[in-house]
C-alpha cells in the first residue's frame, strides 16, 4: 500500500499529460511508462539532476530540457494526438503541438534505446545523480 501511495504522489509532480505521454511510450517501446521507466536513474520521473546515466536517461533529460524551452506553454496541457502507420501525429495548436512534440521526441528516443534500458534502474537514484547537472 505504501508503494501505491508513493507512486500516486510521484504522478502528481510529473509535468506534461502523463496519460498521453505514456501512450506514446507504450506505442514506441511496447513497455509501460510507469512500470518500465519510473526513476531511471536521474531524469525519468519527477525532477532530475546530474549527468544522464544511460541512453534512456538521456532521452528523459532531453525531454526535461524541451519542456524548459517551451515555458510559454503549460506543459500539463491535454493535447490531441493520433497514431498513423506507426507515426505519432500531434495537434496543430501551437502550444499543444510544442508540448506534444517534446513527448513525441522522448518516446521515439526511448524506442530507439529500448534495448539499453536496464531494469536495475527502476525506481533507482544513482549516486551519479548527485553530481553537477549538465546544461541543456
UniProtKB/Swiss-Prot annotation:
GO molecular function, one term: phospholipid binding
The organism's place on the tree of life at top rank: Eukaryota
Expression tissues: Expressed by the venom gland.
SMART domains for this protein: PA2c (SM00085)
Span of the signal peptide: 1-16
SS bond partners: 42-129, 44-60, 59-109, 65-136, 66-102, 73-95, 90-100
Cofactor annotation: Ca(2+)
Principal subcellular localization: secreted
Co-factor: note: Binds 1 Ca(2+) ion.
UniProt modification remark: Glycosylated (2.5%).
Biological-process GO terms, alphabetical: angiogenesis; arachidonate secretion; lipid catabolic process; negative regulation of T cell proliferation; phospholipid metabolic process
Keywords linked to the UniProt accession: Angiogenesis, Blood coagulation cascade inhibiting toxin, Calcium, Disulfide bond, Glycoprotein, Hemostasis impairing toxin, Hydrolase, Lipid degradation, Lipid metabolism, Metal-binding, Platelet aggregation inhibiting toxin, Secreted, Signal, Toxin
InterPro entries in the cross-refs: PLipase_A2, PLipase_A2_dom, PLipase_A2_dom_sf, PLipase_A2_His_AS
Locations listed in the record: Secreted
Active-site residue list: 63, 103
Catalysed reactions listed for this entry: a 1,2-diacyl-sn-glycero-3-phosphocholine + H2O = a 1-acyl-sn-glycero-3-phosphocholine + a fatty acid + H(+)
EC number(s) per entry: 3.1.1.4
One cellular-component annotation, GO: extracellular region
Residues given in the record as Ca(2+) binding sites: 43, 45, 47, 64
Note: Negative results: does not show cytotoxic activity on human fibrosarcoma and melanoma cell lines.
Family: Belongs to the phospholipase A2 family. Group II subfamily. D49 sub-subfamily.
Function as written in the Swiss-Prot or TrEMBL entry: Snake venom phospholipase A2 that inhibits blood coagulation and platelet aggregation induced by ADP and arachidonic acid. Inhibits tumor cell adhesion and migration in a dose-dependent manner. Abolishes the attachment of human brain microvascular endothelial cells (HBMEC) to fibrinogen (IC(50)=0.2 uM) and dramatically reduces its adhesion to fibronectin (IC(50)=0.3 uM), whereas no effect is observed on type I collagen, vitronectin or laminin 1. Also blocks the cell migration toward fibronectin and fibrinogen.
Protein name per UniProt: Acidic phospholipase A2 CC-PLA2-2
Organism annotation: Cerastes cerastes
Amino acid at each position: 500500500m505504501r508503494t501505491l501511495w508513493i507512486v500516486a504522489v510521484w504522478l502528481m509532480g510529473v509535468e506534461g499529460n502523463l496519460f498521453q505521454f505514456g501512450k506514446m511510450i507504450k506505442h514506441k517501446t511496447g513497455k509501460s511508462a510507469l512500470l518500465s521507466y519510473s526513476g531511471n536513474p536521474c531524469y525519468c520521473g519527477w525532477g532530475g539532476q546530474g549527468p544522464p546515466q544511460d541512453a534512456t536517461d538521456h532521452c528523459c533529460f532531453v525531454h526535461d530540457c524541451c519542456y524548459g524551452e517551451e515555458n510559454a506553454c503549460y506543459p500539463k496541457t491535454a493535447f490531441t494526438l493520433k497514431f498513423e502507420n506507426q507515426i505519432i501525429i500531434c495537434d496543430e495548436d501551437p502550444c499543444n503541438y510544442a508540448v506534444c512534440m517534446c513527448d513525441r521526441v522522448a518516446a521515439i528516443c526511448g524506442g530507439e534505446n529500448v534495448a539499453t534500458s536496464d531494469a536495475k534502474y527502476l525506481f533507482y537514484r544513482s549516486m551519479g545523480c548527485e553530481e553537477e547537472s549538465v546544461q541543456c
